[in-house]
Amino acid sequence: PLLFSLTMSFHDWPVVGERTFVGLDNYRTMLFDDPQFWESLWITAKFAAIYVPFNIVMSFFIALMLHHANAWSGFFRTAFYLPSVISGVALVTIWSWIYSREYGLLNFMLSFVGIDGPNWLGDPGLAIVAIIIASLWGFGGTMLILLTGLKAIPKELYEAATVSGVPGWAQM
């Protein structure tokens, strides 16, 4: 698929009809003639700059709590991981319903405290925040990877750090 996509990028390839080799013309058009490319690149950079740190910090914090918990850790591990395996179509449907301006759950809850809910997905400033929150829904995969890494650390290392006088949080 990667090589096929690369091949397609050097062609004008209509849905019906013959393809025409155009060389680097598609890339020139994208970089110099299409303002939407730069806008979408900027939005993607903002998304990544906000989402990645939040995802890692939140996943690490939850993994750390589950690593030290005993009683209900299996239940919570499953509860946090389960949303990350939900189908993408189902996830989009659920979050579209939550963010809907007319009948959305979020605006319905805000109406109880007298707040007229905004258009979460229609306002460009709020849409990026709404999408980041919806994307963080699946942080369970990252959390599970970090939890597995924490479980792989031998207990002897923690014991040696404790004997050496290293405080609890600094042991990380």
Q: Model-found features: residue ranges?
A:
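A structural signal for multi-pass alpha-helical bundles of membrane permease subunits
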Residues: 1-172
